Amino acid sequence: MQLARQYKVLLIGDNCTDEWVYGNCDRLSPEAPVPVLVREGIDTAPGMAGNVKQNLESLGITVTFLCNKEESKKTRFIDSKTNQQIVRVDSQPDVKPLHPSQLQMALLHETYDAIIISDYDKGFLPDSKTISDIAGRYPNTKVFVDTKKTKLPTEFSNVIYKINKKEFEALDPGNIPNGENMIVTLGDEGAVWNKKKFPCNDLVRTFDVTGAGDTFLAALVFYFVQLPVMEEAIAFANKAAAIAVQNPGTYTLRMEDVDRILNI
């Protein structure tokens, strides 16, 4: 699949490094009833909004990225023989919030085919004001928002929320977006948009769900900026996420995956 032109996306969100420490784990510690992991190797990849960025860029989208500069890391310790995650250790520093001047500069010199907010609620976007500011200023640009916040602006028709079932259930009852402005992902059951369910028809072996929501979001925007038909974009994103969960760690989509999805 060839892009008809060069598409540009503004991505704003929390960034981290995903890390996997692999090793052999076949005995308990004599000091405490916990497993001993003999380290064999380490893999790292961009996580959270960084994962969205990597997927978009891999598919040929130009991305302007506004994120925290402080290094956040999620380290998972994995038994190589079973691929069982033993424990996850998070390093989460205090994050300086997005400064209005950063956003102003990014919006001043470029026009974007879409804007993405990937908000893991780690402090870079301390409230929902950024959503309102962007959506109100650019009413003709779709703003895709993946957020863990429970109080959301609902008055903007150009905002598309992408949240999972748990996040949907946690929403403030007085701040639930209209059905056409909200996609709720359901894991291996697919997604719901505008009261319509989009099942994931691919029967796949789930190897690792890390970053699957980021893959869904990136694939959704990748498709939508080229062909703004939400039903088709969701179906495409479902298949992209199904590919991601079959791979260990955070998987980066490739154009070969796009061709495979479109040829199914």
Model-flagged regions — what are they?
Residues M1-A32, E40-F207, F224-K239, N247-I264:
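Ribokinase/PfkB-type carbohydrate-kinase core domain
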Residues D202-L220:
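Short glycine/threonine-rich catalytic loop with a Thr-x-Gly-x-Asp
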